[in-house]
């Protein structure tokens, strides 16, 4: 059974992923198509907050991820890896109540489920470095 927060993260990931192929459509509208009556009120609110936060901070998030890609550009990554990294980087930097380990573990699970056999390990390496150098100090105490 998926926890409400895990389902929420999956909804955000799916919206980000679909937006890659539906660029002319609004990201928030894509999310609304994914959120149905099986999501509780808090999960919907959290998903909407994540999407708004990712949209508002996307250039900074992408720039930060790009700094840790060795011999790769963000555009060369698979859509799965790119959007898992965006989701998790947002959560690491802006969602103060979520422990770093939880964010990274959840991102690895999504990457393994939807990506290639190497996606989990790849995402783990990038996020670990981002967390160590950029996560707010109080997150290390959670």
From Swiss-Prot:
Coiled coil: none
InterPro entries on file: NusB-like_sf, NusB_fam, NusB_RsmB_TIM44
NCBIfam families the record matches: nusB
Protein name as annotated: Transcription antitermination protein NusB
GO cellular component: cytosol
Presence of keyword Oxidoreductase: no
GO biological process, one term: DNA-templated transcription termination
Gene3D superfamilies: NusB-like
Protein function: Involved in transcription antitermination. Required for transcription of ribosomal RNA (rRNA) genes. Binds specifically to the boxA antiterminator sequence of the ribosomal RNA (rrn) operons.
Keywords recorded for this protein, A-Z: RNA-binding, Transcription, Transcription antitermination, Transcription regulation
């Amino acid at each position: 059974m998926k926890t409400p927060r895990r389902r929420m993260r999956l909804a955000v990931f799916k919206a980000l992923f679909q937006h890659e192929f539906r660029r002319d459509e609004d990201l928030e509208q894509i999310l609304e198509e994914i959120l149905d009556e099986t999501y509780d009120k808090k999960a919907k609110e959290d998903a909407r907050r994540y999407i708004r936060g990712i949209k508002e901070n996307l250039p900074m998030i992408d720039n930060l991820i790009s700094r840790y890609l060795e011999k790769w550009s963000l555009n060369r990554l698979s859509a799965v890896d790119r959007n898992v990294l965006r989701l998790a980087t947002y959560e690491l930097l802006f969602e103060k109540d979520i422990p770093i380990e939880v964010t990274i573990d959840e991102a690895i699970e999504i990457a393994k489920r939807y990506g290639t056999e190497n996606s989990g390990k790849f995402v783990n390496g990038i996020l670990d470095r981002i967390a160590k150098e950029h996560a707010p100090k109080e997150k290390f105490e959670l």
